[in-house]
Curated annotation (Swiss-Prot):
This is Gene 2 protein. Residues 1-36 are annotated as: Disordered. The gene is 2. Residues 1-12, 21-36 have a biased composition (Basic and acidic residues). It comes from the Viruses.
Amino acid sequence: MPPTELEKKRGEYNQIAIDAQKQHAPTDEKREAKRKQLMDRVGGDWQALDPDHHDAIKVAMDDAMRKILSEEEIVHRTKHFGDLLDSGRLKSLFEVGFSAGGDTPTERALLEDAWFGAGKVPPIYSAIEFNGAPTAGLGMYGGTKLYMKDSVKDRVTVTIGDSLMSSWDVFPGRPGDGVGLWASLSKIEGLVDPSKTREENMQAVYDSFKKYGTLDGFIEAQIHGGVLVEDIKKVVFTQPPSPIFTDKLDELGIPWEVQ
């Protein structure tokens, strides 16, 4: 079956994003060394666990995150909404040249290649929002909130906390990925008891993740495969928007509101 027009557009945009990242990409040797360094650091404590406790924690965190992804929203905050409407897509650090997190393109490329592999579409960094509750620490990323369609959830990885700031504690992934290092062991080890039911352990970890994602920090969602305007379910402005923006959203058929 030939690709749809949307698939063609996504492919063209994603190639632009890949080409921009390649200008800052590390050598294969540096990428592999960084990946080993991160995996050894993040995974070291897990290796010391009793096997039953290890397995119970992995199951509980996977169950908790599956519940979160099935029930909650993926939200991207932006200060550059006009650029999104003009270009039709969100751009990564490698195209815009700056990051709210303060890292350089070279630093980001090394981490992303170590996490996800070389030659991949740079992820778009977003967060999980729990039932519309304010999320701590995200205001600096912008006051316009883009709510993603549920289909986007199929191509996200997650970390409990900021992946850049917590790169020595977590390694991006998703439930059942076979690695399971996307949550810091120190934050959940004491919550899981192999003698308890799977549901009890899941609920304990879920409550911890939710508390962290609403009060203490945020759960980061790295969206892979690019974000086009077609991926946006609705837009929420925290300040009255320009009619230029709202007229364009109406034209695109994307609901919007002001909170």
